[in-house]
Regions:
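Buried hydrophobic positions in well-ordered alpha/beta secondary-structure cores of metabolic enzymes
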Residues: 22, 38, 70, 99, ...
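Short helix-coil transition/hinge motifs at the ends and kinks of transmembrane helices
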Residues: 116-124, 197-199, 267-271
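Alpha-helical structural signal in soluble globular domains
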Residues: 41, 65, 69-73, 98, ...
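Structured C-terminal cap/extension of enzyme domains
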Residues: 40, 213-333
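Catalytic alpha/beta core domains of metabolic enzymes, predominantly
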Residues: 135, 147-266
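A general structural signal for well-ordered alpha-helical segments in protein cores
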Residues: 31, 67, 92, 184, ...
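Active-site beta->alpha loop and helix N-cap motifs at the rims of alpha/beta catalytic domains
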Residues: 2-154, 299-300
Length: 333
């Protein structure tokens, strides 16, 4: 696939499903059913190695298994992306080679946590980390991070540009900017400048679902986020509408989804990145797309009150929950 992997459209970061609240065993059939739903919606790729997929909480054997299942379900229709989540460079390289050999078509690359100590002065650390991975693994990857992120994902536009130029197989960037459209513009500008210098295409993706219309109108290429596990059809519809120039339709869909978007982003009860992935799973569970919403520890479930808020928000957004709100038990694992 190499440099021909064009990063655009809707790329869901797919959650895993467990057989019960112990979270000790993957529910492979339920996972396949979720993938089949997503593949019916004209998505552009399946990202199975991201944080929304709890990659950092899975064994390597489990990570390879979800890649294999995704490849079986995708049947070549869309690429399957594994994930690189490692603090040591040698570990990142090893993860890449193992997943590559298992069939991953590309990767979502998460920065090491050491970058969080000082993103301004740690630029060379990140670039060396990524470049060594790039040269050893020789596979396309999408980088993750942005200027308004927290912790290790805070990456400045000048670093985005430099990495995009120096890492040959970097083909896309998942930009995290919260609600800051100006920050997205800065990243987009930096990456487009890198495109001109290198002659390669770099897909610029919004990390969230709250300003999807705005970021695509600005020149972005789509979205990569865990929210698409419950709203992939709507996200694809928004993307296509903007690309066709039907901005009225795109905003109508985005505005209709505002209640559940706000509920998941914690607008009603306190913004918190920590619970985004659990809320994505709860939304998918309420809508019947997965049979259970459990996540492995240290993640704790959202409260019953939050589940009630989310169910109400789904209804207000024109969606049809098939389950009642209830308390979610804490995982055993």
């Amino acid at each position: 696939m190499g440099k021909n992997f064009k990063v655009e459209g809707v790329l869901p970061s797919v959650c895993v499903v467990y057989k019960d609240k112990s979270c000790r065993e993957l529910d492979e059939e339920a996972y396949r059913e979720l993938l089949r739903y997503l593949l019916q919606t004209d998505i552009s790729a399946l990202v199975v190695g991201g944080h929304a997929g709890e990659a950092e909480c899975l064994s390597m054997e489990e990570r390879l298994r979800v890649i294999k299942i995704a490849k079986e379900e995708a049947k070549g229709k869309v690429p399957v992306l594994g994930g690189i989540i490692a603090d040591a460079t040698w570990m990142a390289i090893e993860q890449g080679k193992i997943q590559r050999d298992a069939g991953a078509d590309a990767f979502l690359f998460c920065p090491p946590t050491i970058i969080a100590w000082d993103p301004n002065t740690a630029e060379n650390l990140l670039i060396e980390h990524v470049k060594r991975f790039d040269k050893q693994v020789k596979m396309p990857f999408i980088m993750f991070g942005g200027p308004t992120s927290e912790g290790s994902y805070q990456i400045l536009p000048k670093t985005l540009k430099r990495l995009a130029i120096e890492a040959e197989n970097l083909v896309g960037w998942k930009i995290t900017t919260r609600y800051d459209l100006g920050a997205f513009r800065g990243c987009l500008r930096a990456l487009r400048e890198a495109e001109k210098q290198t002659g390669k295409q770099i897909g610029v993706l919004n990390a969230g679902d709250h300003i999807l219309v705005e970021t695509i109108r600005e020149g972005g290429d789509g979205t990569l986020n865990g929210g698409s596990i419950y709203r992939a059809a709507e996200d694809v519809e928004i993307y296509k509408a903007v690309k066709k120039g039907d901005i009225v339709k795109a905003y109508a869909i985005q505005d209709k989804l505002r209640p559940i978007t706000d509920a998941i982003r914690g607008v009603l009860y306190g913004y918190s990145h920590t619970y985004f992935h659990y809320r994505y799973k709860v939304a998918a569970w309420l809508l019947g797309k997965i049979p259970r919403p459990y996540m492995r520890l240290p993640m704790l479930p959202v409260s019953k009150e939050e589940v009630e808020v989310m169910r109400d928000a789904l209804i207000k957004s024109g969606m049809k929950p098939v389950r009642e709100a209830q308390a979610i038990e804490v995982s055993d694992m």
